[in-house]
Amino acid sequence: MENQPQNKPIIELRSIKKSYGSNTIINDFNLAINNGEFVTILGPSGCGKTTVLRLLAGLEELDSGSIILDGEDITNVPAEKRHINTVFQSYALFPHMTIFENVAFGLRMQKVPNEEIKPRVLEALRMVQLEEMADRKPTQLSGGQQQRIAIARAVVNKPKVLLLDESLSALDYKLRKQMQQELKMLQRQLGITFIFVTHDQEEAITMSDRIVLLRKGKIAQDGSPREIYEDPANLFVARFIGEINVFEATVIERKSEQVVLANVEGRICDIYTDMPVEKDQKLQVLLRPEDIVIEELDENEHSKAIIGHIIDRTYKGMTLESTVEFDHNGMRVLVSEFFNEDDPHMDHSIGQRVGITWHEGWEVVLNDEDNQ
C-alpha cells in the first residue's frame, strides 16, 4: 500500500541562521516538513537551498536556531549519528567495491552484525530493482543504475529522512524523465520523507508533493506544484516556474466581489480578483502561454481583442508555440496551443494579424506595487 504524507512534522527548522563571514545566507528561516512528504527545495543559484540541505545533513553548523527531527533536537548531533542520509549529485560510489559492498558500507561502519547485513542489502537492491547487479562494479553500470545504487546505499540504513542534492542533473534528458517517475514511486513505496534540492522547476513540478521556492534565503512561496504554477504569490515565483506573460492593467471599476472591469493592454474586459482595488490603480495580469487564445484576423477586421501580429512560430509536436507582437506597444507574448492538424487556422503564418484573448478566470492578478 502506498504511503501517504502524514500531518506530523518529521523535520522542523526553527529560526535558523547561517552566515559565511559577513555574508548571511539564511536568517530567521522556519520550515516544517511532514512525515512521508516528497518536498522539493527549489530556487536559483545562491538562494540558500544547498545551505539548508547541508545544515539538515549535519555538514554545516548553525549560527543560531534549531533543527528538530521527529521531536528530537539534533542541532548539535554529528552527521553520522543523525537518522538522515544524503544522495549527492556525484553519487560518491566506491569504484573498487562491488555494488553489494557499496550498499553494505554504511552498515559495516555502524557495526551491524554480519548475519543482518546480507538480507538488508539484498532488500535495498530489490527495492531499486538491481538485485542481480550485486557482484558488479559501479563502472559497469549506467548513470541511472548508479543513481539507484546510491539511493539503495542511503535507504539501507533506514533513515527517517533522505536528502537528494541535484541528484538527477548528471543524467541525459530521457533517463532523467524516467528517474523522476522512479524516484517518486520509490519514495511512496519506502514511506521515507524525501527532501530534494534542485534548480530545475520541471523536476520540482513532476515529483513533489510540495515545493518550497527560495529567493535570497527567504521562502518566496510554499505550496503544492499546482498551487505554485496556477496561483503564484508574486512575479518572481511566476517567472521562475514555467513561462509567463505579464500584461499591464488599469482598474476601471469593481463590478462584484470577484470581478473587476479593467483596461488590459487596451482591451476593456473583466478580470477576476478579490483583492481591494481603486479606480485607476495599476495591476499586473499574468497569463501562462496555454491560457491565451489566438484568433486570426483579416487586416481590416475589427476586434475587441488585443491586436498583434505573429512574428515567430515553433512546432513542438503536441503543441504549436507562437510569438505575438502587440501593435500598440511592441510587447511580445508567447502562446502555446495544442496542435490540431485538421484545423486550417492552427498553423499560423508569420505576419498573420491576430487578436489575443484568454480563457476567462484563468488569469492571475497581482498588485503592481508588490512586484518591484
Swiss-Prot record:
Give the matching SUPFAM superfamilies: MOP-like, P-loop containing nucleoside triphosphate hydrolases
Q: Where is ATP annotated to bind?
A: 43-50
State where the protein is found.
Answer: Cell inner membrane
Domain ABC transporter, first and last residues per copy: 11-241
Q: What does the UniProt function comment say about this protein?
A: Part of the ABC transporter complex PotABCD involved in spermidine/putrescine import. Responsible for energy coupling to the transport system.
Listed under subunit, the entry gives: The complex is composed of two ATP-binding proteins (PotA), two transmembrane proteins (PotB and PotC) and a solute-binding protein (PotD).
Q: According to its UniProt record, which reaction does this protein catalyse?
A: ATP + H2O + polyamine-[polyamine-binding protein]Side 1 = ADP + phosphate + polyamineSide 2 + [polyamine-binding protein]Side 1
Q: What is this protein called?
A: Spermidine/putrescine import ATP-binding protein PotA
Q: How does it sit in the membrane?
A: Peripheral membrane protein
* Source species: Haemophilus influenzae (strain 86-028NP)
Identify the Pfam families for this entry. ABC_tran, TOBE_2
Which is one GO molecular function term here?
A: ABC-type putrescine transporter activity
Q: Domain of life, per the record?
A: Bacteria
